[in-house]
Amino acid sequence: MQDQRINLLAKNLVNYSCKLKKGEKILIEAKGVDYMLVNAIVKEVYKVGAYPFVEMFDNRVTRELLMGETEELAKLRAKFDGARMKEMDAYIGIRGGNNAVENSDVPEENLQIDSEFYSHPVHHELRVKHTK
């Protein structure tokens, strides 16, 4: 049986924080967390007649991707994820993880490339400025 606080949180995120309306599209990104909150959010999105798009990440896989990050790859990822983000009306990001130092051995140069050529254009320029 699911903790009812998860359902209440999902309801508040969708209806209060995002003020999601019928026909709107929302991207739900979850990194390093269990599926229960994501499922509860999806149910609430459907209740208002909106469209959920979900992507779940495992921090260990993200680490491996970052180990090989290049400017070219970051720009390609930004191109594809940016196109998706442009279509969204709202966004919910859920972050967690068991290992706070998961990326500690990723070269600093790779992290900078990811930040400059992926995170900044997709999240700071598109998501923050154009979604709820």
Question: Which stretches of residues belong to each language-model region?
Answer:
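Active-site bordering "gate/hinge" segments
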Residues: 1-132
